[in-house]
Amino acid sequence: MRIPEKFTINSQEITVELVNTLPSQNFGEYCCITDKIKLATNVKDDGTVIPLKEEQIENTFWHELLHAFQWHSKGVFSEEESNTYAGYLIEFFKSSGLIIK
């Protein structure tokens, strides 16, 4: 899957940036102030840099996208919703044969 560099939600441009690592072993983050999603390509664990698999980065993208949806629809975030719905989306795309380019 090609992760977009930017897209629009609720007339707001959301940008996406791939970064080497994020603090606190985070795989990704959405900032509602800058409307930016950052996705890590690696995670540090006890000083060791571990590369993330493509599937992990894609799952993180969907998770953070759902945080953007949450923020723009109700002004709050829910980790439980984002985790659950990101998993549902990935399972749907894989099982349906729907291809996202």
What role is predicted for each listed range?
Residues 37-60, 72-73:
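Short pre-active-site segment immediately N-terminal to the catalytic Zn-binding motif
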